[in-house]
Design a protein with these regions (language model features):
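An N-terminal domain-start capping segment
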Residues: 1-2, 49-51, 125
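Conserved short-loop catalytic and cofactor-binding motifs
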Residues: 6, 42, 108-111
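Generic structural detector for well-ordered beta-strands
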Residues: 8-12, 57, 84
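Glycine-rich portal/gate segments that line the openings of hydrophobic small-molecule binding cavities
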Residues: 27-80, 88, 94, 130-133
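Beta-strand/loop substructures that line and gate deep hydrophobic ligand-binding cavities in soluble
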Residues: 73-122, 126-133
Length: 133
């Protein structure tokens, strides 16, 4: 059973520009579809299944180019996502994203991860369009 998915996108923008955008929690609302608000250690997610307020920790390291998120749900469940922005020799950067299976019952993991993986592809395309000239 798959417990994670890794996706990436090449973006015609500097590593610094993309990293600086990603490290700001409030920008999640511009590219991560479920986020309707984010900031000050909190976020609100809305999906077809409903809305929920969560704790949101962001760990960003400019030198490494990493931006990692820890989402803590009211029931104590924890969701993780790790990402990295790397530069290329083509005046572009590559943004890679590790999506972990959500904190749901094991029998729901595969379907939930498949759905989130499809959504992530769309979100990465949105991010790319926001960052490119």
């Amino acid at each position: 059973m798959r417990m994670f998915d890794v996706q990436g996108v090449e973006i015609v923008a500097s590593r610094q520009k993309v990293f600086e955008f990603l490290r700001v929690p409030g920008n999640l609302t511009r590219w991560a579809h479920a986020f309707v608000s984010a900031g000050n250690g909190r976020a609100r997610l809305e999906t077809p299944a409903g809305a929920i307020d969560i704790a949101l920790e962001v760990d960003a390291d400019a030198e490494a180019g990493t931006v990692d998120w820890r989402l803590t749900f009211p029931d104590g469940g924890v969701g993780l996502a790790q990402s990295r922005v790397t530069e290329t020799t083509r005046d572009t950067c590559i943004y890679s994203f590790v999506l972990h299976a959500p904190p749901v019952a094991l029998e729901q993991v595969e379907g939930a991860l498949d759905a989130q993986s499809a959504l992530l592809r769309s979100e990465l395309a949105t991010l790319k369009s926001l960052m490119e000239p």
